[in-house]
């Protein structure tokens, strides 16, 4: 036992002794306990001298360690010194009270027994008896039957008896023999009579006097006791419902039992039942030893005016056990007569009133049953048949048929209700007919639905109407049907019950050991189906399968515990009375029914005694900690082994004392083996964590177990020592590992050495340690203590290097900034892991030391700031740091008087504080953390593990196969592992739980309005659920976060239903929508609440379900593999890794890729999206591991905390873990906002959203996802939303929505920039993209500042500060080129404003203006692209012509459509100013809908808006004004919160720390505003203020770093664009070649067919041309006649169709459209030429214009041009252009066009023969 535990026990013992001494005579005063808990006191003993017929008494001083045997030996000498010489008697010591006596066990401690009289201030005596003495013959016969002689020598004189005397003697012997047999049958009664006889003799011969008693003043003591009992009862009355009239006194008469006592008055409440009144009355009458079930209370009604003693005309009715006497007495009308209550023995033939309806007039024998009992007799309640509910709160009964057992073994169903079927008719319906009826509500339930009849041992069900839906085993019935045990009974559509008849089950259980009717359905685990319940009357009933026999399953039926545990609770129990306890349990078990629930462990283990050592050695010595699936398997196996040794199954032949010694020996052997294993593996961190977890869990099991705790005190001490020893070894291992990487803190960034350790190595070590502890399920309290040691080690190592090595130069501004920056990574990691308090506490000295090195310390005004900031540094440490300080070349020196003043202040503050705490003032930090090791009080696995944990069976399988042991599951166990724990009143717990469920409820809950002031968040955890009969979802309070606004208000409680928030109804809303509404509220929120709505709607069990954390623990524990991240976060990239420049991308193959889930699994996984996602240890999934999402019923009740938001992150696993144990993670509780509900379903086709899950090669959670959305963490105090930023957010979102159609940039949306809570927090985030700013925290800024120390990629996620803005994510890997085959060296010009979709004219003008401003930047690139286009134009024209009919559906494309080989993801980031800075710090993160993510784009204008090379003066001015307003608002907010905190009288430590940080932030903001104001007033004025210089220096450094980062990102972007363009060009060329080949084939076929038709027409045309030749020679030749005639029906195209855009290319449509708008002449457009007379004159239309007058010149030439028109029409169908295209012109026409400078070179080639024919015609 630890020192703390022993001190606590000693304190409790001292309190008990103090109470004894206060009430007892001084003679019997007991001394105070020693360190070993030993005490002494005087005791009075009596000796019964049978020979003398009297009692002797003596007082001796006894020790608490003296046993009964020791005392007997002493008393034998004291009372009769010559006894031992004359005989060898057997003595016993008895504890005697007025009500009886008890013999003490030989090993009991008499002084401890006497001290236990304290409980009720009892009085008693100790009597020594000689067991060999016969009962004194006080009536021995001498000379006749009437004659008596004095006892003595003469009593042995014998005489001859007469015949009559012999006959009488024989008769008396027979009577004595009969009485002896009766005594054997009723041992308790016999014992009671013997006890009463001895007690009567003792108190008769030695009456109560001041000499014989121990109590100093009995009257005062008893009065005080009565007063205390009265006050306790009155307090119970007040606590029930607050009414003063809920309790009172009641007279109980007992004329038949104690005729000499008129009555006793007992204190009752109006809800106390008759059975309670019986127990209280028996105690009042001194009959507490009697069995209350043998007695009853009868109400006797006397006529008005009659006396109590007058029984004439009295009518007596026996009260049932559940009737309330005081309530009956109060409601009794006085005109009916006088009502009195009599305590009397219960008649043997008594039948409760509820059973009399169908028994009166019938034979009481009833129908004979197999067990010999009939229903006609008075059955105990536990033998009555009953209905147990299978689907409480479900909408349909299918929940029963497909119930699911979760990974932790819990059932998907809630706690069942149970209804006993009395010997009568039980009505079922919505109406309450009487106390016996079953009232149900729900669809399909009629007012009088059906009747259940229990008569003559048969139970039947009869529907009352045809509309009453009643099903038996799934079949609907309409007439009376007999029920058999195990049948399913359904009423309506939502109530399913199982009918159980214990008597039938008992018969079947005799035939088969395990032949029960099991519930149908998948049996995932033994013990999963739990149907145990407790009725209001206190009876325990079972609704599970049939019982197995005691010989196989009740391993612990005779478990060892103290006798009458209720009477001895809270007493001193150094030794347990095993034999009496087992005798008591044997008597008790005779009265219990075998079908009751077995209150035993979920499983037990059996092993042979011969293989005990091998079994224990296999469990402890040969267990490989790295391969165990369930890490606590040894603990649970060893605990089951201990319980097995204590049970009667293990060697039933041994005595209880031997069994106790055996259990002690087994536990000692376990502990000894465990000690050896820890010693052997003291250098292996994984094994140490494993055994530390198991040792602490086993110690908790043994300490809490009510039987083991008192017999294994030595083993408990050793186990506690083992936990501490393993802890010490593990700390040493981890500190040794850390020591190797500690030089990383002193790594000079200017000396970039690859061999030296980096800060990432330290973080990797810490993360490996955390992962190890969580996998091993180490208690959270031990985890915090261990990391406190590691943080102290870091603090000690660095601080001692600073103060002890003055020549190293570390005491300088430069190194102070470096160390402080590195410590920032540790702090950020600790905050992410929930260890921020431990880190803040144990790193405080080195943090304050680095702060001192970097802060101002040059003038006396700095002294108060130094002392207030460095308050933990003592005078020696401050002096060493300041005296050893190395100033930079241009840094002022520290004045000596300043050092002296600072040291003097520290001597009066820090030094005095240390001395008052008993610590020495020393320079160096102590290597050992001066904190005691504390064993956790709670937080152990047994509180949450239910049934048999997953992995335990696998752990035992090898041992079972070798015959070492056997695991026996107990299917009827309640499923808890705390069943044997001290104070685990499991029965009353379940009884109380079901009593609450069975209470009739009011029709509607109370509606109240609550107004909360949100300071640190609303502080509620909500859950969405639908109650029975409800049509819509409701939002219920799952829990109230301690310290939140709701907790402070006090009116909200778990189970309340939230009806509306700020007037907006929450009824019918989904959980995530409700959470969104609740977070989008102002600082004052008004809630409409239905008090305890969950209970009114049948959702009371919802409140008992484990929180998400517990669920996750169970999930993770159940499967042994890390749970996959919630689907809601699959769209989010880990921006900390691939978004910031300090984290270069790793190859694709180094990222873990999740397995593709099947459809059902994916659906189940999606249903779990919105559950809280705990922040796990950032470790990769187990190799080959699959998450526990299997097809089955997923949990549909989810919890959201509106007071806590945390980020969900995942880290890549490229490097091995520091402490690999490849299974099992352990989670920590976080409340996380759920993702959008739209993520539960796939996007519709038109959404253009990629179906991630249908692309196995796409890694949905990797850093290559095309959509990067950063979810921002918020601590609870930062979860405030200000209305002033609401408009700004909507403006940004609107801007994004306007760009939805553009896909040039697919980037992050709704990124929220968080405000830092203190100035120092600005400097230590690895996410910062301004490295120079991290080292310019303070100081004049005129001396050297180190460059940024950027961490290299590690296997764990980088430390992420949640109070700093997140880095922008990378751009998408896929980037579709605007131009096929064109390498892009620089970004393209941005699209014009009208490309972005419908916008207002003002916004469009702004967009166009920005485009013009950036046009110059792009001129070179555009010119080069124009040249490329010109060169490629003809090739593009040919490709586009073939793709007219191949336009692809935009829906078929996705951002990842062409991502073929993403080996090198882009590291490009967009500038941080574009979107992130426009979302303000206190803004709530909105729920991202999937529709929001469809091609969210950022235009290139925005991309370059932060570029200093092309500033936008208008935008910059507007931005500066906005920033100024925001800064002012931040300062106002800070002032308001600071004022609120300062006004608080009692601030917590967290509030004080927050106030300090807010003050720093407020000062910083004020200085920043002042500096800006000065700059505006006078830009030329030199600002000498050091703080202003610091601020400007930092801002300038940020700007420079941002410019460098942007330039670097721009170059990376261009390089990636070129690579992707080359890939696209190669792919498109291949596609083009394939299409060209297909086109050539089609063209060849078509031209062949055309030529055949052409030859036939050619001859006819030639003849006509010959006929026209003469006429043509006579007519004057006009130029227009030399071209081929146009067809008769040809109409020139209008001007509006001039651009005639070609069809889109086979890339994304949006990309092509941008290309067209960006450069209208970039692609070839066919030119239509209408050559006529006006063309010859070069009219205003121009050569390329189209005139509508061409048709007028055609009509005169109909006949001679008929053939040519036919030819032209046939060619028009095939050529891409119209008939006016250049390829249709004659040679002369081409010559004419050529002479005019027009392009006629593009001509579709025909066959050689066709060309020759055409030339022949043209020349004629």
Curated annotation (Swiss-Prot):
The modification N6-acetyllysine is found at residue 1803. SMART domains: DIL, FHA, PDZ, RA. Residues 146-186, 1410-1446, 1523-1561, 1593-1665 form a coiled coil. One of its GO terms (biological process) is brain morphogenesis. Keywords: Acetylation, Cell adhesion, Cell junction, Coiled coil, Phosphoprotein, Repeat. Residues 160-172 have a biased composition (Basic residues). It is found in: Cell junction, Adherens junction. Residues 1364-1373 have a biased composition (Pro residues). Residues 1007-1093 form the PDZ domain. Residues 1576-1587 have a biased composition (Acidic residues). Residues 653-908 form the Dilute domain. GO terms for molecular function: cell adhesion molecule binding. Gene3D superfamilies: 2.30.42.10, 2.60.200.20, Phosphatidylinositol 3-kinase Catalytic Subunit, Chain A, domain 1. The modification Phosphothreonine is found at residues 1232, 1330. It comes from Mus musculus (Mouse). This is Afadin. Residues 1132-1143, 1325-1337, 1443-1457 have a biased composition (Polar residues). Isoform 1 is expressed only in a restricted set of epithelial structures during early embryogenesis. Disruption phenotype: Mice show developmental defects at stages during and after gastrulation, including disorganization of the ectoderm, impaired migration of the mesoderm and loss of somites and other structures derived from both the ectoderm and mesoderm. Cell-cell adherens juntions and tight junctions are improperly organized in the ectoderm-derived cells. No redundancy exists in the function of afadin during gastrulation. Residues 39-133, 246-348 form the Ras-associating domain. Residues 173-189, 356-371, 1113-1128, 1152-1172, 1252-1262, 1407-1440, 1487-1503, 1513-1526, 1595-1675, 1759-1772, 1800-1820 have a biased composition (Basic and acidic residues). One of its GO terms (cellular component) is adherens junction.
């Amino acid at each position: 036992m630890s020192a703390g535990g022993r001190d606590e026990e000693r304190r409790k013992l001292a309190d008990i002794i103090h109470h004894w001494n206060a009430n007892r005579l001084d003679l019997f005063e007991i001394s105070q306990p020693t360190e070993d808990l030993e005490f002494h006191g005087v005791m009075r003993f009596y000796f019964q001298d049978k020979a003398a017929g009297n009692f002797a008494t003596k007082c001796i001083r006894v020790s608490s360690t003296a046993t009964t045997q020791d005392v007997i030996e002493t008393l034998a000498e004291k009372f009769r010194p010559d006894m031992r010489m004359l005989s060898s008697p057997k003595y016993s010591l008895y504890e005697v009270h007025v009500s009886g006596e008890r013999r003490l066990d030989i090993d009991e401690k008499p002084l401890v027994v006497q001290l236990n009289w304290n409980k009720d201030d009892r009085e008693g005596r100790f009597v020594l008896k000689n067991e060999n003495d016969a009962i004194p013959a006080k009536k021995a016969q001498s000379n006749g039957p009437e004659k008596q002689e004095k006892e003595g020598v003469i009593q042995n004189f014998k005489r001859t008896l007469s015949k009559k005397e012999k006959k009488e003697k024989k008769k008396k012997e027979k009577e004595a023999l009969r009485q002896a047999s009766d005594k054997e049958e009723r041992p308790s009664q016999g014992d009671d009579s013997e006890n009463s006889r001895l007690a009567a003799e003792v108190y008769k011969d030695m009456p109560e006097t001041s000499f014989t008693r121990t109590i100093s003043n009995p009257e005062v003591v008893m009065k005080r006791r009565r007063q205390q009992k009265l006050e306790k009862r009155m307090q119970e009355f007040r606590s029930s419902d607050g009414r003063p009239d809920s309790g009172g006194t009641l007279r109980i008469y007992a004329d038949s039992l104690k005729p000499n006592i008129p009555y006793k008055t007992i204190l009752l409440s109006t809800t106390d039942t008759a059975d309670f009144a019986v127990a209280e009355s028996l105690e009042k009458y001194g009959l507490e030893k009697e069995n209350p079930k043998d007695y009853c209370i009868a109400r006797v009604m006397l006529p008005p005016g009659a006396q109590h003693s007058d029984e004439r005309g009295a009518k007596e009715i026996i009260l049932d056990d559940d009737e309330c006497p005081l309530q009956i007495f109060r409601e009794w009308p006085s005109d009916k007569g006088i009502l009195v209550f009599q305590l009397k023995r219960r008649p043997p033939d008594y039948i409760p009133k509820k059973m009399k309806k169908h028994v009166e007039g019938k034979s009481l024998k009833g129908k004979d049953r197999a067990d010999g009992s009939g229903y006609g007799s008075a059955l105990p309640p536990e033998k009555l048949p009953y209905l147990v509910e299978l689907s409480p709160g479900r909408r349909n009964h299918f929940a029963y048929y497909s119930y699911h057992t979760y990974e932790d073994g819990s059932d998907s169903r809630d706690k069942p209700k149970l209804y006993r079927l009395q010997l009568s008719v039980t009505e079922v319906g919505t109406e309450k007919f009487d106390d016996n009826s079953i009232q149900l509500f729900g669809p399909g339930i009629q007012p009088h639905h059906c009747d259940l009849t229990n008569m003559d041992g048969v139970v039947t069900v009869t529907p009352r109407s045809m509309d009453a839906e009643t099903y038996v085993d799934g079949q609907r019935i309409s007439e009376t049907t007999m029920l058999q045990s195990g049948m399913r009974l359904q009423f309506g559509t939502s109530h399913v019950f199982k009918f159980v008849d214990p008597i039938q089950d008992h018969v079947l259980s005799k035939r088969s050991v395990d032949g029960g009717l099991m519930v149908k359905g998948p049996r995932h685990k033994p013990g999963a189906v739990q149907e145990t319940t407790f009725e209001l009357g206190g009876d325990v009933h079972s609704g599970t399968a049939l019982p197995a026999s005691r010989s196989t399953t009740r391993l612990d039926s005779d478990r060892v515990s103290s006798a009458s545990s209720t009477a001895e609770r809270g007493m001193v129990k150094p030794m347990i009375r095993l034999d009496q306890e087992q005798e008591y349990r044997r008597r008790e078990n005779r009265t219990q029914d075998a079908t009751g629930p077995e209150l035993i462990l979920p499983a037990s283990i059996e092993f042979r005694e011969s293989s005990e050592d091998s079994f224990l050695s296999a469990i402890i010595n040969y267990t490989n900690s790295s391969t165990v699936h369930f890490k606590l398997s040894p603990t649970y196996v060893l605990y089951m082994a201990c319980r097995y040794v204590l049970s009667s199954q293990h060697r039933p032949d041994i005595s209880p004392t031997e069994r106790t010694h055996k259990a002690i020996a087994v536990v000692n052997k376990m502990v000894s083996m465990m000690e050896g294993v820890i010693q052997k593996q003291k250098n292996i961190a994984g094994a140490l964590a494993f055994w530390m977890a198991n040792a602490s869990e086993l110690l908790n099991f043994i300490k809490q177990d009510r039987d083991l705790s008192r017999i294994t005190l030595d083993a408990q001490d050793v186990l506690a020592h083992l936990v501490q020893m393993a802890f010490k070894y593990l700390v040493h291992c981890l500190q040794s590992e850390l020591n190797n990487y500690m030089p990383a803190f002193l790594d000079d960034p200017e000396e970039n050495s690859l061999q030296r350790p980096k800060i990432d190595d330290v973080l990797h070590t810490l993360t490996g340690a955390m992962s190890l502890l969580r996998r091993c399920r180490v208690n959270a309290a031990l985890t915090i203590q261990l990391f406190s040691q590691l943080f102290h080690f870091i603090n000690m190592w660095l601080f001692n290097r600073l103060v002890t090595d003055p020549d190293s130069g570390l005491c300088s501004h430069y190194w102070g900034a470096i160390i402080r920056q590195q410590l920032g990574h540790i702090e950020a990691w600790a905050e992410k892991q929930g260890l921020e308090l431990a880190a803040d506490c144990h790193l405080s000295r080195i943090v304050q030391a680095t702060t001192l090195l970097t802060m101002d310390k040059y003038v006396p005004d700095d002294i108060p700031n130094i002392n207030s900031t460095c308050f933990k540094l003592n005078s020696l440490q401050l002096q060493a740091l300041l005296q050893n300080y190395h100033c930079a070349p241009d840094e002022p020196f520290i004045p000596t008087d300043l050092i002296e003043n600072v040291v003097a202040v520290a001597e009066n503050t820090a030094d005095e504080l240390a001395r008052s705490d008993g610590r020495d003032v020393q320079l160096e930090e102590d290597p050992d953390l001066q904190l005691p090791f504390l064993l956790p009080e709670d937080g152990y696995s047994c509180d949450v593990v239910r049934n048999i944990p997953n992995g335990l069976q696998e752990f035992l399988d090898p041992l079972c196969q070798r015959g070492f042991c056997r695991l026996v599951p107990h299917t009827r166990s309640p499923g808890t592992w705390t069943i044997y724990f001290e104070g685990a009143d499991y029965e009353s717990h379940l009884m109380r739980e079901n009593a609450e469920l069975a209470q009739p409820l009011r029709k509607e809950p109370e509606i109240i309005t609550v107004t909360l002031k949100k300071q640190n968040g609303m502080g509620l955890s909500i859950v969405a659920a639908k109650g029975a009969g409800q049509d819509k979802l409701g939002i219920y309070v799952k829990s109230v976060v301690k310290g939140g606004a709701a907790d402070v208000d006090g009116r909200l409680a778990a189970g309340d239903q939230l009806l509306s928030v700020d007037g907006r109804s929450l009824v019918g809303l989904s959980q995530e929508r409700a959470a969104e509404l609740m977070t989008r509220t102002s600082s004052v929120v008004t809630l409409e609440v239905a008090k305890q709505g969950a209970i009114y709607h049948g959702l009371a069990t919802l409140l008992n379900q484990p929180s998400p954390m517990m669920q996750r623990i169970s999930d993770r524990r159940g499967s042994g593999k890390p749970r996959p991240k919630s689907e809601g976060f699959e769209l989010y990239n880990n921006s900390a890794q691939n978004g910031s420049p300090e984290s270069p991308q790793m190859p694709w193959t180094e990222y873990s890729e999740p397995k593709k889930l099947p459809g059902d699994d994916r659906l189940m996984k999606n249903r779990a999206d919105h559950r809280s996602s705990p922040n796990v240890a950032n470790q990769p999934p187990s190799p080959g591991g699959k998450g526990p999402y299997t097809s089955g019923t997923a949990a549909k009740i989810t919890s959201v905390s509106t007071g806590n938001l945390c980020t969900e992150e995942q880290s890549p696993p490229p490097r091995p873990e520091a402490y690999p144990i490849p299974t099992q993670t352990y989670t920590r509780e976080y409340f996380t906002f759920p993702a959008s509900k739209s993520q539960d379903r796939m996007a519709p086709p038109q959404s253009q959203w990629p179906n991630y899950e249908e692309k196995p090669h796409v890694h949905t959670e990797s850093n290559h996802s095309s959509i990067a959305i950063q979810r921002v963490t918020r601590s609870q105090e930062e979860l405030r939303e200000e209305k002033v930023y609401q408009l700004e957010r909507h403006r940004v979102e609107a801007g994004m929505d306007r760009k939805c159609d553009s896909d040039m940039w697919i980037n992050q949306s709704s990124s929220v920039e968080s405000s830092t809570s203190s100035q120092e927090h600005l400097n230590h985030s690895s996410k910062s993209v301004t490295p120079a700013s991290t080292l310019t925290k303070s100081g004049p800024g005129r001396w050297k500042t180190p460059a940024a120390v950027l961490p290299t990629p590690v296997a764990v996620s980088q430390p992420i500060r949640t109070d700093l803005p997140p880095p922008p994510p990378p751009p998408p890997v896929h980037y579709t080129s605007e131009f096929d085959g064109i390498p892009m060296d620089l970004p393209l010009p941005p699209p014009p404003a009208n490309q972005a979709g419908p916008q207002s004219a003002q916004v469009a003008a702004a967009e166009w203006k920005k485009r013009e401003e950036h046009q110059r930047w792009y001129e070179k690139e555009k010119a080069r692209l124009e040249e490329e286009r010109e060169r490629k134009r003809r090739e593009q024209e040919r490709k586009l012509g073939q793709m007219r009919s191949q336009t692809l559906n935009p829906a078929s494309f996705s951002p990842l459509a062409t991502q073929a080989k993403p080996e090198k993801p882009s590291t490009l980031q967009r500038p941080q100013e574009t979107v992130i800075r426009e979302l303000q710090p206190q803004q709530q993160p909105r729920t991202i809908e999937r529709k929001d993510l469809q091609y969210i784009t950022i235009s290139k204008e925005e991309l370059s808006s932060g570029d200093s090379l092309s500033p936008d003066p208008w935008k910059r001015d507007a931005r500066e004004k906005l920033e100024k307003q925001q800064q002012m608002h931040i300062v106002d907010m800070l002032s308001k919160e600071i004022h609120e905190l300062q006004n608080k009288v009692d601030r917590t430590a967290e509030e004080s720390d927050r106030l300090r940080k807010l003050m720093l932030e407020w000062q910083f903001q004020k200085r920043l505003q002042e500096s800006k104001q000065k700059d505006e007033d006078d830009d030329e004025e030199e600002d000498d203020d050091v703080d202003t210089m610091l601020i400007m220096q930092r801002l300038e450094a940020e700007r420079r770093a941002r410019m460098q980062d942007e330039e670097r990102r721009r170059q990376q972007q261009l390089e990636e664009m070129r690579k992707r363009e080359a890939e696209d060009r190669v792919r498109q060329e291949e596609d083009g070649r394939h299409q060209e080949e297909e086109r050539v084939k089609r063209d060849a076929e078509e031209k062949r067919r055309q030529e055949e038709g052409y030859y036939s027409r050619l001859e006819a045309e030639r003849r006509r041309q010959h006929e026209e030749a003469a006429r043509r020679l006579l007519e004057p030749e006009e130029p227009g006649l030399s071209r081929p005639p146009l067809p008769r029906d040809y109409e020139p195209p209008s001007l509006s169709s001039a651009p005639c855009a070609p069809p889109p290319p086979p890339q994304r449509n949006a990309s092509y459209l941008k290309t067209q708008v960006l450069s209208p002449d970039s692609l070839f457009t066919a030119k239509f030429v209408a050559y006529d007379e006006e063309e010859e004159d070069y009219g205003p239309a121009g050569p390329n214009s189209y005139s509508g007058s061409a048709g007028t010149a055609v009509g005169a030439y109909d006949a001679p041009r008929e053939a040519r028109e036919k030819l032209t029409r046939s060619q028009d169908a095939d050529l891409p252009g119209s008939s006016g295209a250049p390829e249709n012109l004659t040679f002369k026409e081409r010559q004419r066009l050529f002479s005019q400078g027009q392009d006629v070179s593009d001509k579709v080639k025909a066959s050689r023969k066709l060309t020759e024919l055409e030339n022949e015609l043209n020349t004629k």
